[in-house]
Curated annotation (Swiss-Prot):
Residues 2-146 form the Globin domain. Keywords: Heme, Iron, Metal-binding, Oxygen transport, Transport. Belongs to the globin family. This is Hemoglobin subunit beta. PANTHER family: HEMOGLOBIN FAMILY MEMBER (PTHR11442), HEMOGLOBIN SUBUNIT EPSILON (PTHR11442:SF7). The keyword Transport applies. The gene is HBB. It holds the Pfam family Globin. Red blood cells. Involved in oxygen transport from the lung to the various peripheral tissues. One of its GO terms (molecular function) is haptoglobin binding. InterPro entries: Globin, Globin-like_sf, Globin/Proto, Hemoglobin_b, Hemoglobin_oxygen_transport. GO terms for cellular component: blood microparticle; haptoglobin-hemoglobin complex; hemoglobin complex. GO terms for biological process: hydrogen peroxide catabolic process.
Amino acid sequence: VHWSAEEKQLITGLWGKVNVADCGAEALARLLIVYPWTQRFFSSFGNLSSPTAILGNPMVRAHGKKVLTSFGDAVKNLDNIKNTFAQLSELHCDKLHVDPENFRLLGDILIIVLAAHFAKEFTPDCQAAWQKLVRVVAHALARKYH
């Protein structure tokens, strides 16, 4: 994957302003609410019975932060995303058996969360760079499935 200097700047510039805990929690909560079938991968998280329960669930919040922290690893390693996510791909494929389509869904939700939090700064160019990033990350996470 080739990243232009502008794409790198748009990604790293916005990333520096992201509250990882809040945006991560919101992104994972939205995934579980909008795509309820994804909840089956989180049965150990306790009460996921309603949007209110999901939004208030501390395990959802903690895992959302963990997920978005790993996105930070992608931002730091734009030229080596495939290797950055090799172990996570193995874990999600071999041990957790997560449908790789869910990585794409979460990426799309992250775009929505970023747009909501950074409305003015999230220009079409910025969105395009981030859309490319979430696609590359989803592809890297799905790699062990092929």
